[in-house]
């Protein structure tokens, strides 16, 4: 189907199901003190600007978000976080750190933990090409606040977290 027009009738005739998986573009905020400091950005704002730059399009925002020459901290260990890591490296970040709330997943799925029972379905340690570009990764880190001066972020405060077995009363 690549390179040619496909009608809705073609899709209905040739497939039993059609899955549209464009990803979430609405950010999930981190409601902690200092979140509004300059220098704390949503991933999609950063990635969208880079996509516009690569396409040669004008940026719609007054203020550019660039990782060039900076120490960058990416919060979140999913695909979007991985995209931010790789983009930061390609923009010439000084160093890229990645914090994930969940504990480090196993490198191999334990035989006694089929996919529905593991904390994240099919979650095993994934290292993307973005991670292979360098940087540091840490797991079990929960952000408690950001602090800074003159309205600009300078420090992230966090605590180490460990997840225990689910509570039998509520499953959490």
Locations of regions flagged by a protein language model:
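A Rossmann-like FAD-binding core segment of flavoenzymes
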Residues: 1-28, 52-62, 89-172
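Glycine-rich dinucleotide-binding loop and its adjacent helix/turn
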Residues: 27-91
